[in-house]
Swiss-Prot record:
It is a single-pass membrane protein. It is found in: Cell inner membrane. GO terms for biological process: protein transport by the Tat complex. It comes from Pseudomonas paraeruginosa (strain DSM 24068 / PA7). This is Sec-independent protein translocase protein TatA. Residues 43-82 are annotated as: Disordered. Part of the twin-arginine translocation (Tat) system that transports large folded proteins containing a characteristic twin-arginine motif in their signal peptide across membranes. TatA could form the protein-conducting channel of the Tat system. Its main location: membrane. Keywords: Cell inner membrane, Cell membrane, Membrane, Protein transport, Translocation, Transmembrane, Transmembrane helix, Transport. InterPro entries: TatA/B/E, TatA/E.
């Protein structure tokens, strides 16, 4: 048993019904259902659009890689001011 037993959930459900009323909870449930349906439809439509589009050609790099010749120089450390 965790923090909430089944009896606790019954009491919480009764309090929620008393506070919001059954009509408002019914409307809330239908609104949530419509939102989930719309989300699923949008996801499926997006996946279908991706399937219909042909694979894009890989783009050529704008700048070809090149090597820069450089030479390291030794730098003297500044004198400490202790």
């Amino acid at each position: 048993m965790g923090i909430f037993d089944w009896k606790h959930w019954i009491v919480i459900l009764i309090v929620v019904v008393l506070v919001f009323g059954t009509k408002r909870l019914k409307n809330l449930g239908s609104d949530v259902g419509e939102a989930i349906k719309g989300f699923r439809k949008a996801v499926n439509t997006e996946e279908d659009d991706k399937k219909e589009q042909p694979a894009a050609q890989p783009a050529q790099p704008l700048n070809q890689p090149h090597t820069i010749d450089a030479q390291a120089q030794k730098v003297e450390e500044p004198a400490r001011k202790d």
